[in-house]
Amino acid sequence: MKKKIVVYIAASLDGYIARENGEIDWLESVEGEGDNGYEAFYQTCDAVVMGKATYDHVLKLTSNFPYHDKKCYVFSRSAQGKDQYVEFINESLASFLNNLNQDTKKIWLVGGADILADFLKAKRVDEFIISVIPVLLGGGIPLFKQGIPEMNLKLTDIKQYGQIAQLYYEK
């Protein structure tokens, strides 16, 4: 069975996932409902993948690593081996996915924009769950970088959590 790769992420209404400096403080400015469906989604995932900058940012945000109960992989050009939380990946995306344990069926691609662009260029994203935050940032780190391939998607669901619209798309 093919591994399903899901992007589950929040973005501003104008398409940014963070300010230019990487800050995501604006996420707290909007009222949602509970955890906005996060825990239900998280429990369906077998593994978590992110880029090194996202990993560093997660470590800065909290003293308790939030993904400690899942296999967690961090793509990095510099870090190697493992630390207490993650395994660093220096190999190609295709090689990484081929070498993953057969039991790994659903992978959450946390971000950021660079690793997302790599997965999109390799045509390896199967589903998007985007929580649209009703904030206009006017600039920052875009969810989708220029140069990604065109991709037609199908809207499969829309959920509302307070002021947050969560959009579900599949390829």
For each predicted feature, which ranges?
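Enzymes that bind and transform nitrogen-containing heteroaromatic metabolites
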Residues: M1-K171
